[in-house]
Amino acid sequence: MSALKQIKFDEKGLIPAISQDFKTGEILMFAWMNQESLKLTIKKQQAVYYSRSRQKIWFKGEESGHIQHIKEIFTDCDNDVILLKIEQIGGISCHTGRISCFFQQLDKKNWKIITNMIKNPRDIYG
């Protein structure tokens, strides 16, 4: 795939990927991709990531049903970060049951939770 030739994966063969709600612009999550997951994302028009902890390809929503449909894909000026503009199915992108993984805000010296849980993770994952 010629589009992948300009992408700069790191020494581990990975590239950071940010997902953003295509309608609101809200940043939903950060994950890693490898060449295979990026190819699958482009081919299937569905977010596919690489799990460093599990050392395997991870289809977003494969367990939870919270799939990310791709609307647009961007790379940054250095071609070393991917931005996915997505439609989040089910309204939950974070494994904590929230719309976004970025739900903690620094309030002077402490982290404050600013977003409510939409669904308890036990109800999502069992």
From Swiss-Prot:
Catalytic activity, as annotated: 1-(5-phospho-beta-D-ribosyl)-5'-AMP + H2O = 1-(5-phospho-beta-D-ribosyl)-5-[(5-phospho-beta-D-ribosylamino)methylideneamino]imidazole-4-carboxamide
Residues the entry annotates as binding Mg(2+): 76, 78, 80
Q: Which Gene3D superfamilies match?
A: Phosphoribosyl-AMP cyclohydrolase
Cofactor list: Mg(2+); Zn(2+)
Keywords (alphabetical) are:
Amino-acid biosynthesis, Cytoplasm, Histidine biosynthesis, Hydrolase, Magnesium, Metal-binding, Zinc
**Predominant subcellular localization, coarse grouping:** cytoplasm
Q: Which residues cross the membrane?
A: none
EC numbers: 3.5.4.19
Which terms in the Gene Ontology molecular function aspect does this entry carry? magnesium ion binding; phosphoribosyl-AMP cyclohydrolase activity; zinc ion binding
Protein task: Catalyzes the hydrolysis of the adenine ring of phosphoribosyl-AMP.
Q: What is this protein called?
A: Phosphoribosyl-AMP cyclohydrolase
Q: Which organism is it from?
A: Vesicomyosocius okutanii subsp. Calyptogena okutanii (strain HA)
Q: What is the lineage of its organism?
A: Bacteria, Pseudomonadati, Pseudomonadota, Gammaproteobacteria, Candidatus Pseudothioglobaceae
